[in-house]
Amino acid sequence: MQGLIELGLRRLVLCPGSRSGSLATAAGLLASSGQLQLNTAIDERSAAFLALGLATAGGSAVAVVTTSGTAVANLLPAVIEADRSCQPLLVITADRPIRLKACGANQTVNQEDFLRPACRWCGNGAPEGLHAMASHAVLELAALAWSQAHGADQAAAGPVHLNLPVEEPIHAPLQEHQPLLDAVLASDEASLFPLQPSTIQSNRDVPRLDPSRPGVVIAGPWRGLAQDLSAHQQAVRSWLVCSGWPLLADPLSALPVELPGRLHHWDLQLEQLISPEPLQVLRLGPLPASRRLEVWLKRNAGDQVLITEGEPRYMDPLGLATQWSGGLAAWCCAQPLDQASRPLSADHSAWLRRDQALGLWLEEQLVSEGPVSEPALAFQLADLLPPGLPVMLSASSPVRDWLTWSGRSGSDRRCFSFRGASGIDGTLSLAMGLALETGPMLLVTGDLALLHDSNGWLHGQSDGPPLVVLLIDNGGGGIFQQLPIEQASPKRFDALFAMPQRVNPIALAAAHGVPGRSIAVIDDLPEALSWALAQQGPVLLRVCTDRHADAAFRRKLRSAAQNVEPGV
């Protein structure tokens, strides 16, 4: 544990268990000396998502420690998300020694293999037990795990698994603890092993695009580390200035709202974005959550270059782009860019005028009074939130509605959503982790996503993070209402797909000590937000909507948007 702290570990999420007792004791001693921030969690699945939220916000690996057996299996959903989202996560599991393997011993499984397919690297302690390893071997294991989690060997950051067999006796006498802590505190070494930061390298020669010819930049969700974001943002700005290309950005791209050429309502006008010649396309990271954009790219695009932030795996489901994994900042540095500002072309200026007209039109359509619709909620909410307040959007309808309906205000803040595997798993726990690291935050989630991770409320007890949870309660899986599924199976749609649950979310939150309020009409949203943001810990705001009516409303709005004429 001390070795990991020397490398940069600052936070650890600890789950209960006997076999992991020595790890728990070490974490407790280091936390008591101020060297480690310690969170505890009884549900390993929720704990791993909490750690992932912390790591995403902080830009550095957070450890989650569990005992043996099914505890390890419960880590898999968060490990998959960390893998697909390219975020560092350090999973440390206690295991039985080799003598208890494959002989029917209790709580003994092949846990060393459970997480392997989704991990950047898996390491094991000595089969006989951690006690059989020399100190330098333990430190080498820690150093290797830490470097792999942060993107060693030309890979992107991601999860690693340290599986540590522990032999009995597994609980040292109390009098043996203090000498260990004294030894740690007495060490005057600056570092056990200084770790040199890895440099992202490309998997091939640098592909080129011509900024003097027409093109477009499409920015998907940011998949780099927090500390690399500033350089990425500057690189985007430099390319936009020298090329004069418009920008179609996902709210999760973490790009500033005032970037030149940025379209805020592009998802509503893709059919109108026409160019007389095939456009070059600079794609940043994975595609935004828009099937219409995929169709548009297939129909309109010329040469495409896809830049990832160290992710060497193929990331183009359309099969249209040349991929380069060295990161955008390095890509821009590898080719000479004209520093002179290039204006938007006449065609692209028309795109921008239409975008501005759509913004004014949406103000008229998505009014701040009357019953709550989900498009109006996304539009109004983005305007009402304090400047700079970050938002997490659950990976279902909320993230799609924010992309389409929130407009300029929705892009004027940092937005998070864990769409690596596009699941609703761990939604509340992820948001708790983000808020613990960033401070006040808003989570926008659906009812099934919140209920699926209701154990996340446990992280809000006693000094919980300042998290406002805005629950869109539409009686089931509203995302399915927007797909052709209902027409294919109209009679049993609710039972087979929407799956509404009879749970009172306000009462469930209250059972965990979390206060809550219900919002009846959208007029009440400003006062409810003011109350929620004034609370010291987690709070729940429940908004009831009609998923049937909202699905029809979205279709109506999207159809009408095609007739909005651009301003002069």
Curated annotation (Swiss-Prot):
Species name: Synechococcus sp. (strain CC9902)
Report the protein name in the record.
2-succinyl-5-enolpyruvyl-6-hydroxy-3-cyclohexene-1-carboxylate synthase
Subunit record text:
Homodimer.
**Superkingdom of the source?**
Bacteria
Q: Which family does it belong to?
A: Belongs to the TPP enzyme family. MenD subfamily.
Q: What is the top EC class of this enzyme, as a single word?
A: transferase
**Enzymatic reactions:** isochorismate + 2-oxoglutarate + H(+) = 5-enolpyruvoyl-6-hydroxy-2-succinyl-cyclohex-3-ene-1-carboxylate + CO2
Which keywords appear in this protein's UniProt record, sorted alphabetically? Magnesium, Manganese, Metal-binding, Thiamine pyrophosphate, Transferase
Task: Relate the protein's function as given in its record.
Answer: Catalyzes the thiamine diphosphate-dependent decarboxylation of 2-oxoglutarate and the subsequent addition of the resulting succinic semialdehyde-thiamine pyrophosphate anion to isochorismate to yield 2-succinyl-5-enolpyruvyl-6-hydroxy-3-cyclohexene-1-carboxylate (SEPHCHC).
List all disulphide bridges recorded for this chain.
none
InterPro entries in the record, alphabetically? MenaQ_synth_MenD (IPR004433), MenD_middle (IPR032264), THDP-binding (IPR029061), Thiamin_PyroP_enz_TPP-bd_dom (IPR012001), TPP_enzyme_TPP-bd (IPR011766)
